[in-house]
Structures are given as structure tokens and as C-alpha cells.
Amino acid sequence: MRTIIGDSVNKSTKLKSDRFRSMWDGKIKGEKYDSPDFSSGEVNGDVLLLRYNLYNDEFESKKTINGNTHFVERTLSKVVIYKTNKYFFLPYYYKGGKNFNVGYLSLITELDSIRLYRKDEVKFQPATFSPTTIEIGFPPRFIKRKLFFIQKKEATPIQIGKRKMIKLIESLSLDIELK
């Protein structure tokens, strides 16, 4: 014999799982690649087919369309040209200079004493279940964001906010559009 509390918990759990299944088709939303297709690019002057895995922050390469996929070696000496952008494998600091990382930064512009970079990042967000019908649950998904960095002379690049980057570009009278 079931109790009222036991029945309500089972019905509630079934309702949550049914609602989640109707929302999620079994696929992860979003894309971990900049583009899922390989595009022509260069690695230190060698012409290859490339695609950029934003989630793992690495380039995948092929010599031919039907060739095997290889990963571009992540060293400071490698310069990757992908979709007309130059990517440098550099150490950098996130905001506040607390978190240090090493990865690919895309050069926006280079002036006498400063370089401006952009970094496209993808973070994986696991599924969230809504405990009630009022709250919203989400399927697992990749979330894209753009970060901006400034490098003075040969110092380590440091993240700056988009507003500060726009003000800097305006103060330097540069004709650059932040995409």
C-alpha cells in the first residue's frame, strides 16, 4: 500500500523526467568548433586544412579532405593563420591577473608598443533539471563567449573588458570592429 507522499514523489519525478525528455532531443546544444568544417589555413607557412576546437583550445589539421586528422602541436613558436586571423599560442592572464593560462589568442591589431588580442572560448554547461514547473531547466550545451586581451611590449597579455577595449580603440583612432 502506497502513501500519499510516496505517490506524489513518484509522480513528481516522472513529471520532471518527461518534461526534460521533451525538451532535450539527446544532443548537446551548441557547437564546440568554430566551424565544424575544415578550412584552408597555414601553420608556420605550411598550407593545411584546419578547424579550431574552441572547447579544447586546439587546432585540428588534415593534409587532404579524406586524410587523417592530427592536432597542431601547441608550442610558443607556432603561428596559425585560420580564416584570415593570426593565432599565437601564448601564456595570458584572466581578469585581475589571478588566473594564468596558456592558449591560442587571435591578433586583432599590432601597434608600436601594444598588441590587442581576442580569444573565443566555449564552456560546457551540463544539463540542469527544474525542480518546479516555474523554474526553467536546460539541456547540456556549449556556451560561447569572446574575451579581449592587451599586451604591452613583451609582457604577458592580460584580459580587459569589452568596454575598455572599445574605449582604447576609439582613443587610438583605430578602424577596428569587434566581432
Stretches with model-predicted labels:
Residues M1-V47:
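General N-terminal leader/first-domain-start detector
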Residues Y33-K164:
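Aromatic-patch recognition
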Residues L168-K179:
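Long, compositionally biased interface segments
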